[in-house]
């Protein structure tokens, strides 16, 4: 600030302006000297000490509280350096961190603006000051307005200046020098209400801001400038004079009213041969002649100058406190209104009838900063994992898992219930909530399943964008997986066609510009082989062979190529048929992309670093000595991570009622966890979480809710969620919502089978209490399964129009008798969040209940024991029967050190058993284990009870046949 005043005083235009001065002829009077010196030094010291004390007090409760000022100095002007040192000293005296960044005078405006933008995005910096003057090639207005107005501790941003000038305006910051002047007046107990105040000077730095402050204090303000006539006469009427014109000793004694208050802002250097420097510092007021007529007067130096720096420190502290308060606030979700229709229109019509919020608004309501958001159009965005650093001190919100009973082929509405529940919590109960769901695969969307966005008035919007491509994460998985597959086959080809170890090694580690270097992945392989050499030319022939030859056994390769389309013709293919491949053919096949182990790794990784580590650990097969070969051995870890660098960032969308949804990852539920990502859950829980008060260890406010879902029924998806996902995340749900339907329970009670694409038998559309009463056994078993993990259960009866109240009462009674905390009916499909309010209240209550969580099995027990635990405790079976092929693989995994991993069992989702025809709760069956495979990077083994197709096919009439696009680009017929 002082540098700006120096500029003002040295302004040639200002100095040479012709001021019309008409001095008053007044008779000399006798005046007893009663003036008081308003010392800025003393008050500034007091302000710095108070700031120091306040910061220390806050740090006792919140150790991470650290007000920080960043000063950018462009060039090396001596006067600027002096002022910067003054600000640094004042900051240190006040316990404010001050970071000074000196930039070269020749920096371009583009470079400086980028630097400012980066600091704006840095949450550890609370105040940003650009030291003026800047070199002439830099536009000061552009530069100062580039500073985030919430960090503009100088108060120069157009927002702060404009708000200060408005009546009732609310600037974030007041410019430091005017602010200091007001503090001096306040210290002297000068009453401003109704007083005449004259401001000499109209600069945007001092004159205009101080005039606004005086007006806001109800003073009558006159601003004088170089064109003001009769200036002495105007000043002589003033009760308060603010001199900020930049002319040395300009204001004379005969201008001043007896008893006036004079604040001298001027900083001017005039010749003085008695001084070592040859000049002395004076103000705009002729202090010696004026002081005798004043009641209060500020000296120069020692008046306003120290206050400028003190108020800068005060503004930085204010900025830090504001940010701290903002960080503690619970997100406020502003819901979109729903206009319900009956009968309920199609899902796509409902989606298109709603006008979504811009995704930036959804993010802002959640407290996500703009630099933490990457926009993909108007309604989709990615969230940067860097947000964790800002939110690390927050306690997690409440964590709710939505699971289901054993379903019919039509599905029982878990996703719809998830959306309805968060709409009810956020839009109707005022509790900020986030739905976390999987990203749907294109294959089923264009095949027979249709979309996966929920349905009716409880869905993700825009649903066509949700179901088609989204932000390209699945395509990134495809590219990474197929690069790995190509690298494996190519490595085998090159090893087979280059018999000479030395020649092969030279091509594997080539010279570039005459220098041979190991890549980072090669260095890691050398370390695993205990070859501690950095010079490629230093390896012995034996070491060269060990390093270069992977000797992959093609019969053991587990990596297949992937595509995100249902294409049955790719289930088995032969590669290498071209003449260029020299007869090296191999039978392999394609999987659907979401079946790739990379998708499971994406879902289970907590960070980019962990994802890279998991990718490197992926076992792609074995060598001829039956030793595992990893992605790290292939040298693909870095490249695969690079392809998935953006995919690790969760996607943000919204529900029909404008409540936030995170869409991330989508591992194949048949052979994987079938749940959305760990990183999305961790992020969402922080966003709706609460800060704790260190004094009483209580939350400052009630936390919000994160609602996610598990694939298939609880016995499959729920068990995997707890035993695999929760082991990876370290999280445990506070409650489980178990979705049940009258339709599914009738199916388990003996009603005819339900088939997709066919009309429901009349047993499902007419009341039949007997079927329901028999079928609730499946519901009871699933409740028992959940209670095995020690988590409270809420049963949500997803109501259909044909359900009778008597049927629903049978379900409620059975659920409560089985140990559910609540059993409620939910009508969210027809009514959106309004129809799930009772469910939302039940969930809130359930999350407050105590939980006694435990895993189903000890991972250090044998593979066979873990399989038996799942079959007996979750499915109700008697024992397992392991095929010879499966047993051979189990023995191999044990020898390779993979026996202590959790287990995922791939089986039918239509029965608790392995046989889809066995409804209800079958007992005493022997569960077959036909094969066991390993996803070492993802961190689990998976056993197959039946032949699982890892790439679906298309039916005679497939979903894609109805899809059209009109001339406006609107997609029709997809849903």
From Swiss-Prot:
Keywords: ATP-binding, Hydrolase, Ligase, Mitochondrion, Multifunctional enzyme, NADP, Nucleotide-binding, One-carbon metabolism, Oxidoreductase, Transit peptide. ATP binds at residues 408-415. PROSITE patterns: FTHFS_1, FTHFS_2, THF_DHG_CYH_1, THF_DHG_CYH_2. Pathway: One-carbon metabolism; tetrahydrofolate interconversion. NADP(+) binds at residues 201-203, 226. It catalyses: (6R)-5,10-methylene-5,6,7,8-tetrahydrofolate + NADP(+) = (6R)-5,10-methenyltetrahydrofolate + NADPH; (6R)-5,10-methenyltetrahydrofolate + H2O = (6R)-10-formyltetrahydrofolate + H(+); (6S)-5,6,7,8-tetrahydrofolate + formate + ATP = (6R)-10-formyltetrahydrofolate + ADP + phosphate. This trifunctional enzyme consists of two major domains: an N-terminal part containing the methylene-THF dehydrogenase and cyclohydrolase activities and a larger C-terminal part containing formyl-THF synthetase activity. HAMAP family: FTHFS, THF_DHG_CYH. This is C-1-tetrahydrofolate synthase, mitochondrial. It comes from Saccharomyces cerevisiae (strain ATCC 204508 / S288c) (Baker's yeast). The gene is MIS1.
